[in-house]
Design a protein with these regions (language model features):
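Generic enzyme active-site microenvironment
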Residues: 9-11, 96
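Short acidic, Gly/Ser-rich segments with clustered Asp/Glu that frequently serve as metal-coordination loops
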Residues: 12-20
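Short linear S-[DN]-x-LW-Φ motif typified by the pepsin-like aspartic protease active-site region
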Residues: 31-33
């Protein structure tokens, strides 16, 4: 049985780099989408280097978002909707401390999609 593809949508405005060592690539089709803006902490070379130990370059996507109240959240939810429309059987994990995602993600799980939020704390 094939492993389910996992897609990680990273809210860098509030998750910084705490998630880096906690996500894993289970299939060659897994994907990491990093959303960043001027409000995000800088993405350092060391972070990219750690990512490349687990994910290939083709598994990584960087999405610049525009500043504004909840702007990055809306970009993430928009991209999630686009991805679910193309690959409804994939597992989607929003990495964020922001609980504002939860009602939409709950609604998606009620419709049979695998869509969750997880957050990591500084160690």
């Amino acid at each position: 049985m094939d492993a389910t593809r996992s897609v990680y949508l990273i809210d860098t405005e509030n998750q910084h780099d705490w998630w880096v060592g906690n996500i894993k690539s289970n299939t060659a089709n897994d994907k990491v989408v990093l959303f960043y803006s001027v409000n995000s902490p800088p993405v350092h070379y060391e972070l990219i280097e750690k990512l490349l130990m687990t994910f290939s370059v083709r598994q990584l996507e960087f999405v610049e978002t525009y500043p504004g109240k909840n702007s990055q959240d809306f970009f993430i939810m928009n991209r999630l909707g686009q991805m679910i429309a193309k690959a409804p059987k994939s597992k989607y994990i929003v990495i964020s401390e922001d609980k504002g995602y939860d009602p939409l993600l709950w609604s998606l799980t009620q419709k049979g999609y695998k869509a969750y939020r997880h957050c990591y704390k500084a160690t």
